[in-house]
A protein has these predicted regions:
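Internal insertion modules embedded within essential enzymes
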Residues: 1-31, 35-328, 332-359
Length: 359
């Protein structure tokens, strides 16, 4: 045994360490690797459930760097799971990626459960169970530009879509399935049809030219709603405030317009020339990330590569928990927002991203 160990040590490369499993099998790792790197090298489930280590038959911390010739025995438990702190000391890309994957999956499971809880409170247990397997739920996910019911629940749990939006779209889908033709149009349907009729009138564009971003509020003071920050490409509605406060432009599914009576709603639409002129509008994003040095810089670089201007950036951190990044970016369309969010969401350390209001 000693001769075998000595022969291996003679052939070691400076950048590697060679250690042994309890059965005497040799495992090569990058220099500086720890018990966590070793555990993930054995199997992802060993890494995901390790809670301690014996090195040369002595209890050691998981962050202890392994030395050539060490015998490593990983202690596991079904209730153990990775810690974000491990990312501060692991040395191998395999371990780092597996920890990220576990945390993303765990975070997704939690947000899906939160989404389920929100819907179940509104619909009751039996109604919620029926909803999960319904075509209506699938179509609502599609309308929210999401791939599946699970994606919709996760987006609801994180706040990327609101309960109000989901319930409103569910009502529409259920009405369609139960012959909505026999029922009166909702206020939202009426407003949408008015907007469509207005959009069909060519003289409107000639009368207002290309400089007016919102058509339907000519001669009136208006502002974009801080609560939803509408973008060109999104269906919008104007609301008239009590008193002399002008018109506020909201996304059509903004929760804040639910309590506003129909007589104070104004059909409006985006001028198609807005996107051609390259006008930009503020959008607020909330991003949850695995906390590490340089994560904000990496996100800002990704946005810069896409020629996206960032006008404000703030980070909130708490030890052992995901960091939260609040960004204000300037975008010209709903489609650009969708692409931008997908690009950020695809980054390794990003757990989730949602569009938010300004306050």
């Amino acid at each position: 045994h000693n001769d075998y160990l000595a022969s291996i040590k003679e052939d070691l490369f400076d950048e590697e360490v060679f250690v042994f499993t309890p059965k005497g099998e040799v495992v090569g790792l990058r220099k500086g690797s720890t018990a966590v790197d070793f555990a993930y090298r054995i199997h992802s489930e060993v890494g995901n459930h390790c809670h301690g280590v014996r090195i040369n038959d002595r209890l050691s911390t998981l962050s202890t760097p392994l030395q050539n010739g060490d015998f490593v025995n990983i202690l596991t438990s079904k209730t153990a799971h990775p810690s974000l702190d491990w990312l501060n000391f692991v040395a191998t890309p395999t371990a780092r990626n597996r920890i990220r994957q576990w945390y993303k999956r765990s975070h997704r499971d939690e947000t899906i459960q939160r989404g389920k809880d929100l819907l179940e409170r509104e619909l009751g247990r039996s109604g919620f169970d029926a909803l999960l397997s319904s075509e209506a739920m699938t179509r609502v996910a599609e309308r929210c530009n999401l791939q599946s019911t699970e994606d919709l629940l996760a987006a609801l749990g994180f706040g990327a879509v609101t309960l109000h939006q989901v319930l409103n779209r569910l009502r529409e889908e259920v009405r369609l399935q139960t012959e909505a033709q026999a029922q009166p149009l909702s206020n939202e349907d009426v407003a949408r049809k008015l907007v469509e009729q207005q959009a069909d009138g060519a003289p409107t564009r000639e009368r207002h030219g290309d400089s007016q971003p919102i058509l339907g509020v000519e001669g009136l003071d208006y502002r974009l709603g801080r609560c939803c920050g509408p973008l060109p490409g999104e269906a919008i509605v104007g609301t008239v405030a009590l008193g002399n406060h002008g018109i506020t432009i909201h996304c059509q599914d903004c929760p804040n317009i639910e309590a506003i009576p129909s007589e104070r709603r104004l059909p409006v639409r985006w001028n198609p020339a807005v996107s051609r002129e390259g006008q930009r509008f503020p959008v607020h994003l909330r991003i949850e990330v695995i906390d590490r040095v340089g994560i904000l810089k990496d996100i800002l670089m990704r946005l810069s590569d896409g020629s996206i201007n960032v006008s404000d950036a703030r980070v909130k951190t708490a030890y052992g928990k995901p960091a939260r990044i609040e960004l204000q970016v300037e975008l010209g369309s709903a489609e650009l927002l969708r692409r931008t969010m997908n690009q950020i969401r695809s980054m390794a350390d990003v757990l989730d991203i949602a569009r938010t209001g300004q306050g």
